[in-house]
Amino acid sequence: MLLLINNLILNDVPTPWGLYFQDSSTPNQEGIIELHDNIMFYLVLILCTVSWLLFSIVKDSSKNPLPHKYLVHGQTIEIIWTILPAVVLLIIAFPSFILLYLCDEVISPAMTIKAIGLQWYWRYEYSDFINDSGETIEFESYVIPEDLLEDGQLRLLDTDTSVVCPVNTHIRFIVSAADVIHDFAIPSLGIKVVASPGRLNQVSALIQREGVYYGMCSETCGVAHSAMPMKIEVVSTKEFLTWLNEQ
């Protein structure tokens, strides 16, 4: 574990009572957070407006000179409450679709990492690199049992091996599964890809800062579903090349 060896502790992990996103490390996740914040601003305005209208109606209902039982039709208000929500939904949907398609784009990846989900661990393969035996770099990653955890390691998140990636590099993740449906999800990187048997799904990531990033399988896949974490160490290009030479 390169970052631990260098006494560098940069972990992006869930926090107790956390109600917001983890710090973003990719443009995709930055876009997701920005879209969420912008939409939430307008949703709060809508909530306050609707709440005020409801409160006013209930408060002043007894003073209304026109009893509601005689009001059976109101074309103007019906047009307003039909068109206005539709316009709001379109305004929300337009940037959402743009971000969705941008997140699906894989732009000239410099390297590819394959992630295969199995019950209940992950297998990784660096298909662009070959070791001294003429084989691609491949390893399996298992969760560290609670009784074997060392100081600083996280329960149900730390693994015996880590995916090591260089910083500021376009990386393509190809995700699949060998048995049942899993889900490759790393919140800080804005990655969440379904791992389906017999199908290859892909996503790209440009990780912009060094650190240790954790994720969990986000698809119920059996009794040990909670024991399928993923751990990614992002290091400098020099440290990544050193790690490659050791494989």
Swiss-Prot record:
<keyword id="KW-0460">Magnesium</keyword>
<keyword id="KW-1133">Transmembrane helix</keyword>
<dbReference type="GO" id="GO:0005507">
    <property type="term" value="F:copper ion binding"/>
</dbReference>
<feature type="topological domain" description="Mitochondrial intermembrane">
    <location>
        <begin position="102"/>
        <end position="247"/>
    </location>
</feature>
<keyword id="KW-0249">Electron transport</keyword>
<dbReference type="InterPro" id="IPR034210">
    <property type="entry name" value="CcO_II_C"/>
</dbReference>
<feature type="binding site">
    <location>
        <position position="219"/>
    </location>
    <ligand>
        <name>Mg(2+)</name>
    </ligand>
</feature>
<keyword id="KW-1278">Translocase</keyword>
<dbReference type="InterPro" id="IPR002429">
    <property type="entry name" value="CcO_II-like_C"/>
</dbReference>
<feature type="transmembrane region" description="Helical">
    <location>
        <begin position="39"/>
        <end position="59"/>
    </location>
</feature>
<dbReference type="Pfam" id="PF02790">
    <property type="entry name" value="COX2_TM"/>
</dbReference>
<keyword id="KW-0479">Metal-binding</keyword>
<feature type="binding site">
    <location>
        <position position="228"/>
    </location>
    <ligand>
        <name>Cu cation A1</name>
    </ligand>
</feature>
<keyword id="KW-0812">Transmembrane</keyword>
<keyword id="KW-0472">Membrane</keyword>
<dbReference type="GO" id="GO:0005743">
    <property type="term" value="C:mitochondrial inner membrane"/>
</dbReference>
<dbReference type="InterPro" id="IPR011759">
    <property type="entry name" value="Cyt_c_oxidase_su2_TM_dom"/>
</dbReference>
<dbReference type="GO" id="GO:0042773">
    <property type="term" value="P:ATP synthesis coupled electron transport"/>
</dbReference>
<keyword id="KW-0813">Transport</keyword>
<dbReference type="InterPro" id="IPR008972">
    <property type="entry name" value="Cupredoxin"/>
</dbReference>
<dbReference type="InterPro" id="IPR001505">
    <property type="entry name" value="Copper_CuA"/>
</dbReference>
<feature type="binding site">
    <location>
        <position position="217"/>
    </location>
    <ligand>
        <name>Cu cation A1</name>
    </ligand>
</feature>
<keyword id="KW-0186">Copper</keyword>
<feature type="binding site">
    <location>
        <position position="219"/>
    </location>
    <ligand>
        <name>Cu cation A2</name>
    </ligand>
</feature>
<dbReference type="Pfam" id="PF00116">
    <property type="entry name" value="COX2"/>
</dbReference>
<keyword id="KW-0999">Mitochondrion inner membrane</keyword>
<feature type="topological domain" description="Mitochondrial matrix">
    <location>
        <begin position="60"/>
        <end position="78"/>
    </location>
</feature>
<feature type="transmembrane region" description="Helical">
    <location>
        <begin position="79"/>
        <end position="101"/>
    </location>
</feature>
<dbReference type="InterPro" id="IPR045187">
    <property type="entry name" value="CcO_II"/>
</dbReference>
<feature type="binding site">
    <location>
        <position position="182"/>
    </location>
    <ligand>
        <name>Cu cation A1</name>
    </ligand>
</feature>
<comment type="similarity">
    <text>Belongs to the cytochrome c oxidase subunit 2 family.</text>
</comment>
<feature type="binding site">
    <location>
        <position position="221"/>
    </location>
    <ligand>
        <name>Cu cation A1</name>
    </ligand>
</feature>
<comment type="subunit">
    <text>Component of the cytochrome c oxidase (complex IV, CIV), a multisubunit enzyme composed of a catalytic core of 3 subunits and several supernumerary subunits. The complex exists as a monomer or a dimer and forms supercomplexes (SCs) in the inner mitochondrial membrane with ubiquinol-cytochrome c oxidoreductase (cytochrome b-c1 complex, complex III, CIII).</text>
</comment>
<feature type="topological domain" description="Mitochondrial intermembrane">
    <location>
        <begin position="12"/>
        <end position="38"/>
    </location>
</feature>
<comment type="function">
    <text>Component of the cytochrome c oxidase, the last enzyme in the mitochondrial electron transport chain which drives oxidative phosphorylation. The respiratory chain contains 3 multisubunit complexes succinate dehydrogenase (complex II, CII), ubiquinol-cytochrome c oxidoreductase (cytochrome b-c1 complex, complex III, CIII) and cytochrome c oxidase (complex IV, CIV), that cooperate to transfer electrons derived from NADH and succinate to molecular oxygen, creating an electrochemical gradient over the inner membrane that drives transmembrane transport and the ATP synthase.</text>
</comment>
<protein>
    <recommendedName>
        <fullName>Cytochrome c oxidase subunit 2</fullName>
        <ecNumber>7.1.1.9</ecNumber>
    </recommendedName>
</protein>
<feature type="binding site">
    <location>
        <position position="225"/>
    </location>
    <ligand>
        <name>Cu cation A2</name>
    </ligand>
</feature>
<dbReference type="InterPro" id="IPR036257">
    <property type="entry name" value="Cyt_c_oxidase_su2_TM_sf"/>
</dbReference>
<keyword id="KW-0679">Respiratory chain</keyword>
<feature type="binding site">
    <location>
        <position position="217"/>
    </location>
    <ligand>
        <name>Cu cation A2</name>
    </ligand>
</feature>
<keyword id="KW-0496">Mitochondrion</keyword>
<dbReference type="GO" id="GO:0004129">
    <property type="term" value="F:cytochrome-c oxidase activity"/>
</dbReference>
